[in-house]
């Protein structure tokens, strides 16, 4: 009897009776309609909850939050609820018995409620997960990596262990959703080789993904942003997923995608056009500033004029309710919109002014950049900004922040660099990366040029600092050990520092690693050469050779960058036709995908090189393409839109003059008249000097026309006409009469009649911009202009600046003889 009683007591302790079975309690939790019902069940069953039940409870609580709007979420209320705290306490005891999936799901759910990372439950869950790491399947591993990322453990040994597991298992991973999560989490720890393997695996798995999986595509973009890699094939495929699912994208998703595209410098007119339509459909309550500010930032820069007006009117009404961050977002959007609405700008600035002390240094720089671009002036605001920036500069020891502060200070009126500031900069130089060094050089140059008042006290030290920066820059370039590391330095080089101090060292460094140039980096090297204005035929020949040999691996989006240095520097590689043909062939299947503006730039670059692919030109010069281009121009910044329109005109002119057999019509008369009527025709000192000398040589001002326009609107520095005996003809004596202002002197396509055997002469003074920086080699646009003028019947005399300003031509007589020689073929009249 006693034995039976003891067995009965043991059974009671081991298997206590529960009000509901495990399954029935889970079912009840899943049927709950709000958090309070879940908490009631937890309170009722506290003593009997199993590991499956606590896992279900956390999951159900999180699902409720996911279903709520931003305004409805009550994370704080749930986290601080007594039964939530009880649930956390109970869960700690069940951790060893949990399955891998339950363990990680509980950790994930708890993190969504913003529980502190040092909470005992989170520490216990992470510790247990670490022990089991090797046995986690890919899905569980991906969720766990997200939990670590939420705790900012990107560089932790635990994240490193996850990266190692992914590296070992990569070829067997079949789930792109899980892989995309892992890629984002471990992106800070991967090598270039591992990065390339991840990209290749992602491409292989992409076709297995349901096209509606927007989140997977967005995570792939996040990964590419984190590793700073604009991999066009993946970007393009993600872009198609977004476009197909545009009707399901909300404001937040579109905003994030646009920001990622901007960072990756990926331009998709098709996506922007679809997003513009989707955003315009959204009706948001004007009494909810957070959502409306997001809409203003996303839609404003690409909206049609009437929509922009509505957006600005509404944001003006909300301006006094904006937080510091919302005001910053609105200012950035106004910069993108090029909106100088003074009333709205003053309202936004008043909000910014209240919060200046709370902004990060990089945010202060953005504020100053935007206000400068929008031409906003406020002495009080700029004085406060200056004081704030100087105080931070004198206290900071972080190189990146010092670079930002110096940049911001130099953009303010009357910049002045104190001794303390110079010393602070000097102290951190060895720790600066190349981008920071370049920024310091740019802004030190600005200081030296503008700081006239304090020249005696500061310039000496500033010049010494510039010299140290030059030496450090050269040393960094010389120390690079491979092309990838060199590119990390070169991509930040720009402006005066590149052209005046480091161009020779940069080219020499590229030549050291010339054999490493391949399809993966060819566009980067070419884009850098385009910026240098430096002609190195060895590098350009290598680029052409790689393009021909590896054309099937080159993405069409890279072709413009590859062609550009050849076009700018006016260089034909030995395999010219094969090279240009390979580049054009690479683009042919993408002509419907490439942005209209990109095609215009590509067509023009090829035209400069006297290469006119018929398929490309037929694609561009038709009504459908031009309509798409007009739509794109509406949403682009005005400066870029103007550049594209001007390049289209130049391409149209080149095709009409050099390929008349294509029968492309000339349709830019009105555009050119608007453009050139804006030009006042004011001559600089050198031009005035030549004008006077030409008048003397030709027998009077009536025989020379300054700032003339040719047919098809080429601007000619000076024009004159010689008869068959090389006698100058005054303009009053024939059909061309001089005008008071610049404009058309004849129909743009019909050359005025000249006397028999007379010749029209174009005289051009070519400044330093017309030549390569290292040799007197004429650049592409100047060579094209000469070609066109000769087709139009001109004899072209180009006067290089280095000849005109040489010692041999230092006297007026020498220059007069030079002009006579070129005009009449004789040294003296």
From Swiss-Prot:
Swiss-Prot/TrEMBL domain comment: The RAP domain is essential to regulate MT-ND3 mRNA levels.
Gene Ontology annotations of biological process type: mitochondrial RNA metabolic process; regulation of mitochondrial mRNA stability
Protein name per the record: FAST kinase domain-containing protein 1, mitochondrial
UniProt main location, coarse: mitochondrion
Protein species of origin: Mus musculus (Mouse)
SMART domains linked: RAP (SM00952)
Entry-annotated residues carrying N6-acetyllysine: 346
Annotated localization: Mitochondrion
Keywords, comma-separated and alphabetical: Acetylation, Mitochondrion, Transit peptide
PANTHER family recorded: FAST KINASE DOMAIN-CONTAINING PROTEIN 1, MITOCHONDRIAL (PTHR21228:SF29), FAST LEU-RICH DOMAIN-CONTAINING (PTHR21228)
UniProt record similarity statement: Belongs to the FAST kinase family.
Tissues/organs with expression: Expression detected in spleen, testis, colon, heart, smooth muscle, kidney, brain, lung, liver, brown and white adipose tissue with highest expression in heart and brown adipose tissue.
GO cellular component, one term: nucleoplasm
Function according to Swiss-Prot or TrEMBL: Involved in the down-regulation of mitochondrial MT-ND3 mRNA levels which leads to decreased respiratory complex I abundance and activity.
Gene name of the encoded protein: Fastkd1
Domain (RAP): residue spans on this chain: 761-821
One of the Pfam families matching this protein, by short name: RAP
InterPro entries: FAST_2, FAST_kinase, FAST_Leu-rich, RAP
